[in-house]
């Protein structure tokens, strides 16, 4: 295992703010094993994503912000983000630990010729999010759809600004049709980031799951007892009882909300720990750690 080469308390070294999934992919693709960055989630404002170069690919792990001001990744909870990073300095996510943060500006992939570092004005750019569709009325206008992110080029008038879209097209936009996006400071405290977590929303199934570090329960309390095998959904319906409440992010339409005591019909057991199931006609994904499989041999344990 390579030794970690970063200070987890130096937030400016690893926190990149509201960069998109695609930008994180670009920064980490082809980089050395264990290089990582932490960014704002574009799907759930207030959450984070840990993006890591591992096993010749880039994996993205969702970090949920809990109401008690703690942070959760997989089945692990932490008091703060530096503690989470310290944990994964010595524990594998999938095939790697965290070794070093990605440079704040992308480096060429390993094996390519390095280009000289050029100054960039990225941090000085002003971004806006479009609130409505705008078809454009004149040739000089910049048409857009609701939800696009634009870069402001110039403000020649109070109600009309010059902007550039992701395709590089420049034109005039009506100011009442957009809202400003304020880039968060690398040293800023965790707070309301609804207005700056921009980028293309990421579907829940696109996130990887870190290895579980919690040992599976034994059949009995005696040491060395055999592990209870999971039933197969191919042999008929599998039912489980929710043992933990789950309130998914409102933006995640694939997640299944759970109340303690809910009976879940498990339809698929994915190896990444995100199971698929149904409760009262509602279908979706949920972590397997939130439920307990019914044991037909011990009905009393289902209570």
Curated annotation (Swiss-Prot):
GO terms for cellular component: cytoplasm; cytosol; extrinsic component of postsynaptic membrane; neuromuscular junction; nucleoplasm; protein-containing complex. GO terms for biological process: acetylcholine receptor signaling pathway; anterior/posterior pattern specification; B cell apoptotic process; blood vessel development; cell chemotaxis; cell migration; cellular response to interleukin-7; cellular response to transforming growth factor beta stimulus. Coiled coil: none annotated. PROSITE patterns: SH2, SH3. Changing residue 160 to L: Abolishes interaction with DOCK5. Pfam families: SH2, SH3_1, SH3_2. Residues 184-234 are annotated as: Disordered. Residues 123-183, 235-296 form the SH3 domain. SUPFAM superfamilies: SH2 domain, SH3-domain. The modification Phosphotyrosine is found at residues 127, 207. One of its GO terms (molecular function) is phosphotyrosine residue binding. Keywords: Phosphoprotein, Repeat, SH2 domain, SH3 domain. Residues 14-102 form the SH2 domain. Belongs to the CRK family. May mediate the transduction of intracellular signals. Interacts with tyrosine-phosphorylated EPOR and INPP5D/SHIP1. Interacts with DOCK2 and DOCK5 via its first SH3 domain. Interacts with phosphorylated CBLB and IRS4. Interacts with BCAR1/CAS and NEDD9/HEF1. This is Crk-like protein. It comes from Homo sapiens (Human). The lineage of its organism: Eukaryota, Metazoa, Chordata, Craniata, Vertebrata.
């Amino acid at each position: 295992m390579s030794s970690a080469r970063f200070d987890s308390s130096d937030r400016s070294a690893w926190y990149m703010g509201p960069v998109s999934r695609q930008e994180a992919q670009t920064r980490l693709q082809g980089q050395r094993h264990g290089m990582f960055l932490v960014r704002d989630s574009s799907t759930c404002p207030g959450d984070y994503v840990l993006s890591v170069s591992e096993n010749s690919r880039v994996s993205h792990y969702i970090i949920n912000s809990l109401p008690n001001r703690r942070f959760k990744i997989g089945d692990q909870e932490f008091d703060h983000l530096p503690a989470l990073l310290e944990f994964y300095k010595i524990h594998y996510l999938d095939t790697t630990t965290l070794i070093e943060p990605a440079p704040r500006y992308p480096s060429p992939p390993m094996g390519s010729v390095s280009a000289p570092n050029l100054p960039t004005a990225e941090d000085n750019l002003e971004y806006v999010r479009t609130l409505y569709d705008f078809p454009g009325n004149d040739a000089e206008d910049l048409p857009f759809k609701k939800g696009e992110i634009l870069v402001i080029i110039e403000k020649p008038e109070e109600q009309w600004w010059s902007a550039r879209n992701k395709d590089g097209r420049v034109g005039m936009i009506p100011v009442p049709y957009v809202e400003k996006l304020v880039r968060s400071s690398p040293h800023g405290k965790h707070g309301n980031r609804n207005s700056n977590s921009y980028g293309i929303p990421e579907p829940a199934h696109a996130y990887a799951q870190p290895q579980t570090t919690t040992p599976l329960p034994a059949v009995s309390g005696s040491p060395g007892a055999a592990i209870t095998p999971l039933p197969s959904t191919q042999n008929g319906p599998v039912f489980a009882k929710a043992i933990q409440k789950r309130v998914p992010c409102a933006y995640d339409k694939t997640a299944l909300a759970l109340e303690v005591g809910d009976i879940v019909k498990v339809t698929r057991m994915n190896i990444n720990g995100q199971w698929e199931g149904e409760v009262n006609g509602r279908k979706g994904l949920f972590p397997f750690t939130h439920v307990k499989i019914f044991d037909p041999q011990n009905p009393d344990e289902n209570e």
